[in-house]
Amino acid sequence: MERTYQYAWIIPFLTLAVPILIGLGLLLVPPATKSIRRIWAFPSVLLLSIVMVFSTNLSIQQINGNSIYQYLWSWTINSDSSLEFGYLIDSLTSIMSILIATVGMMVLIYSDNYMSHDKGYLRFFAYMSFFNTSMLGLVISPNLIQIYIFWELVGMCSYLSIGFWFTRPSAANACQKAFVTNRVGDFGLLLGILGLYWIAGSFEFRDLFDIFNDSIDNIDNNVLNSSFAILCASLLFLGAVAKSAQFPLHVWLPDAMEGPTPISALIHAATMVAAGIFLVARLLPLLTVIPYIMNLISLIGVITVLLGATLALAQKDIKRSLAYSTMSQLGYIMLASGIGSYRAALFHSITHAYSKALLFLGSGSIIHSMEPILGYSPDKSQNMVFMGGLSKYVPITKATFLLGTLSLCGIPPLACFWSKDEILNNSWLYSPIFAIIASSTTGLTAFYMFRMYLLTFEGHLRVHFKGDTNSSLYSISIWGKEGPEVFSRNLILLSMNNNQNEKVSSFLNKNKIYQIDRDVIKMRSFSTHFVKKETFPYPHESDNTMLFPLLLLAILTLFVGSVGIRFGQGVTDFDVLSKWLIPSISMDLFHEYLNPSADWYEFAQNAIYSVSIAFFGILIANLLYGSVHSSFQNLDLINSFAKIYTKIRIFSDQALNVIYNWSYNRGYIDLYYATILTRGIRGLAESTHFFDQRIIDGVTNAVGITNFFVGEAIKYMAGGRISSYLFFSLSSLSIALILVYFYLYF
């Protein structure tokens, strides 16, 4: 066992070999490296699978041995302090390592086929492997300095991955937006780390936890500066807020969908957004002893839960809908951390990671099947209003996507049901208001997830549809409403152009079929070997190399929730997660959460309540988008109902219009940032530039010009005779003395 721990440092460096070898190959023998480019997927998957086996072995030893292992090397040593680096193996490290390795391996297998026609295939696998290296290095870090180094590497990888298709302007803008937004959080994290070092004199987690735990009474008695400690903890949390897309630094997450779909799956399941959650989990023993910080964490979490769910309601891009879903689910995890439910937070991190990876890879399979028909423009191939009726074309993708959807909705016995219900149960004990918001959001989650599922897989394929006002399909808008006569035309589907300055119009215009855009094909040709791809009249199922990861993730989504189920007294040995979490330096303050007496009656009551809310959301989604709506439409019941209750209909349309505009325009938060912050900063910069150029430089230039002209005037007065110089000097001195005399005596 000791030998296994001794070689644990190799975990992050195994996958580093792939980007190094690809880089050397492209530098030294580029033709040969490119000719065997598909072979590079094998070492990428192989090395990450070794990491997975190694992490699994560590986890088994953690569960059986309840041990923590830390090894440090001194980096710099002086009389006052020393800077060390090394690795820390505890339950949190092993959990995150397995999560990163399993999700990363599935994504790499999937990507081999998904990216096979892309010119950036080698660059893609280099980015992905380095992404995994950075995240694995982050989770084994034993101190804040090492965490910050790998934290920045994770941010760099996300920047490169989001802007993978950098020739596309939207992708270039998205990676810059993600980079700048995360700069805010990273700067806060750096200041927080330096502040903690100023207080405690150490970067090591163990030292920080011991110092702050021993100083609880001192903080209350103002022996330590509690205000400064609160400021430092808030700055640390700011880094997690930006990385995990929490309000108000969440704005980068939907734009990050400009990258390839496998990268989106990795970012949302196991790397980028998981980094912020990991940081909060690692620092939780420290954050709990600092006043008000836990309240701040839970408040930000519950705001993000609700905001992410509302912003997902009206999105038409399938990946952006999933992005806002990720934001909301991360809010649940942050809420659990803020209320001290460490176990529930990690449990939901595990279940959500596999469910969300399944959904993102499923969406990639859908996009992959739609691209030959619609072209390679994300505005079309990712747009749900062009989909529909895909069940018969992509049945395996449909089945796995439905499984992930049900899991995220919290339907038993799937994975997310167990973890989300534990968070809801604990939130009732902490704050009824937070619990009501979190419970209500489960209904919104079920609504927007089934809205996504129904728009994508149910109904008819809308890409080949010719607009006809007599057709029932013509009248279905993104909200499931009728368009032509009875219902408000303001809710008809938006045009495919994302430019919000353009007028709203129906995508099912009469006698019009959308064709593949030549400009779009030309744009994508920078990234692919083939300028044009063979077109198909209908979508087709993905290849086996893409379906295999979907099936494995579906199995994990079915059964991974069992690791955290509390079976009650007498069978607590089956509660694997609680036993797993015991050997953790982050668990010293949370033993009360590890071995509770599970009350199945109370659990069943809460579960029935939450599942009922979820089923209500599913029912509403079916009424608006499913076969129930079509049946009502064929029986003409909606029109007759609307004629009787016209005023109610008008009011409901107006209310839905407000909700739609709020959701589609991202809550106007991006607009606020663009108007207030961006323009304000630019205005301040222009004012500063004017002051510097006209005032500061003007005074300096004026002095120089004045000296120049004075010198020129004196030059013409000089004749080269010493007697003249003496005369002018004595005359000036006489005048000065006369003036002084009159000033003193008169």
Swiss-Prot record:
Keywords attached to this entry: Chloroplast, Membrane, NAD, NADP, Plastid, Plastoquinone, Quinone, Thylakoid, Translocase, Transmembrane, Transmembrane helix, Transport
Location in or out of the cell: Plastid, Chloroplast thylakoid membrane
Pfam name, any one: Proton_antipo_M
Keyword Disulfide bond: no
Enzyme class label: translocase
Catalytic activity: a plastoquinone + NADH + (n+1) H(+)(in) = a plastoquinol + NAD(+) + n H(+)(out); a plastoquinone + NADPH + (n+1) H(+)(in) = a plastoquinol + NADP(+) + n H(+)(out)
Topology relative to the membrane: Multi-pass membrane protein
Coiled coil: none
Entry's Gene Ontology BP terms: ATP synthesis coupled electron transport; electron transport coupled proton transport
Record-listed E.C. numbers: 7.1.1.-
Membrane-traversing stretches: 9-29, 39-59, 89-109, 125-145, 147-167, 185-205, 222-242, 261-281, 283-303, 330-350, 357-377, 399-419, 428-448, 545-565, 608-628, 726-746
Major location (coarse): plastid
A GO-annotated cellular component: chloroplast thylakoid membrane
Classification via InterPro entries: NADH_UbQ_OxRdtase_chlpt_su5_C (IPR002128), NADHpl_OxRdtase_5_subgr (IPR018393), ND/Mrp_TM (IPR001750), NU5C-like (IPR003945), Proton_antipo_N (IPR001516)
Molecular function via GO: NADH dehydrogenase (ubiquinone) activity; quinone binding
Subunit: NDH is composed of at least 16 different subunits, 5 of which are encoded in the nucleus.
Function in brief: NDH shuttles electrons from NAD(P)H:plastoquinone, via FMN and iron-sulfur (Fe-S) centers, to quinones in the photosynthetic chain and possibly in a chloroplast respiratory chain. The immediate electron acceptor for the enzyme in this species is believed to be plastoquinone. Couples the redox reaction to proton translocation, and thus conserves the redox energy in a proton gradient.
Record-stated family: Belongs to the complex I subunit 5 family.
Protein's name according to its UniProt entry: NAD(P)H-quinone oxidoreductase subunit 5, chloroplastic
UniProt source species: Amborella trichopoda
